[in-house]
Amino acid sequence: MKIRFTKMQGCGNDYVYVNGFTEHIPQEKKPEFVRFASDRHFGVGGDGVIFINPSDEADFEMEMYNADGTRAEMCGNGIRCVAKYAHDKGLTDRARFSIISGGKVKYMELTVENGVTKAIRVD
């Protein structure tokens, strides 16, 4: 299985980010993929994997997994990286948008300079 990903960190929390709009892993295979990708000796390495998905309840869904393959609800640094990824990779051109994670909607406000996200406020 070939999956394109991006490795990002926010204040020391490092995750593997997967664009769920273009990359598809069956739900039942995700825990195994997460464990492999998160392994710092044999995989990419990270605190876990975050899938950036479409959502009916917000502009994006942050589907977050811990390194052991279990689901997680929220990481403040992780959601900031999702916001930066979504804007910088062209998933949105708006500086204000919403992300749902763990059943809760959070609102992002980005500071963008020359097309690059420089700061993110989460409400």
For the regions a language model picked out, list residue spans one by one.
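A glycine-rich beta-to-alpha transition motif near the start of alpha/beta enzyme domains, typified by
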Residues: 1-116
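Short, solvent-exposed secondary-structure boundary/capping segments
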Residues: 116-123
